Swiss-Prot record:
Protein name: O-acetyl-ADP-ribose deacetylase
Protein's organism: Cronobacter sakazakii (strain ATCC BAA-894)
UniProt keywords, alphabetically: Hydrolase
NCBIfam families attached to this UniProt entry: PRK00431.1-1, PRK00431.1-6
Active site: 35 (proton acceptor)
Upper lineage: Bacteria, Pseudomonadati, Pseudomonadota, Gammaproteobacteria, Enterobacterales
């Protein structure tokens, strides 16, 4: 698994990958934070694609994911996943967050893409504690990659320094594990 997981700091809309994961809200219609940034960078085609998905499937529930075209982004597709709102950890939040990562990876693999970039899902307005969210992200992604050949590369793209340092530390721990 070493070499398949990467941690970078920056703007997820500028990362050179096949698929960008959007930490979406259930409506899929854009919002604040990374969701708004992705929608602004992708232009009206992304909103139209999300509107079509919503008309066909309704809102996207926490832990679920859908895939659309990428609009004006350099990526080939966008996976929209809804993470849980943090309510103290007693409302199935850890499982829902893991599901958001796992279901996103399954969509990337099922569509034959080789690389994907994830933001720190649920750690903005949804209030998930950053360290706990990073641990779940790493555990879920690394477990998935040990069982599946696709995607070949996963990037955790951290907008802020706090998340970047958390993810860098976890990457170091995972790289040190036997068999990693």
């Amino acid at each position: 698994m070493s070499g398949r997981i990467n941690v970078v700091q920056g703007d997820i809309t500028l990362i050179d990958v096949d698929v960008i994961v959007n930490a979406a809200n259930p409506s899929l219609m854009g919002g604040g934070g990374v969701d708004g940034a992705i929608h602004r960078a992708a232009g009206p085609a992304l909103l139209a694609a999300c509107r079509q998905v919503r008309q066909q499937q309704g809102e996207c529930q926490p832990g679920h994911a859908v895939i659309t075209e990428a609009g004006d982004l350099a990526a080939k597709a966008v996976v929209h996943t809804v993470g849980p709102v943090w309510r103290g950890g007693q409302d199935n939040e850890p499982q829902l967050l893991a599901d958001a990562y796992r279901n996103s990876l399954q969509l990337v693999a099922a569509n034959g893409y080789n690389s994907v970039a994830f933001p720190a899902i649920s750690t903005g307005i949804y209030g998930y504690p950053k360290a706990a969210a990073a641990q779940i992200a790493f555990e879920t992604v690394s477990d998935y990659l040990t069982r599946h050949p696709q995607p070949k590369q996963v990037y955790f793209v951290c907008y802020d320094e706090e998340n970047f340092l958390l993810y860098q530390r976890l990457l170091g721990q995972y790289d040190e594990q036997p068999g990693a």
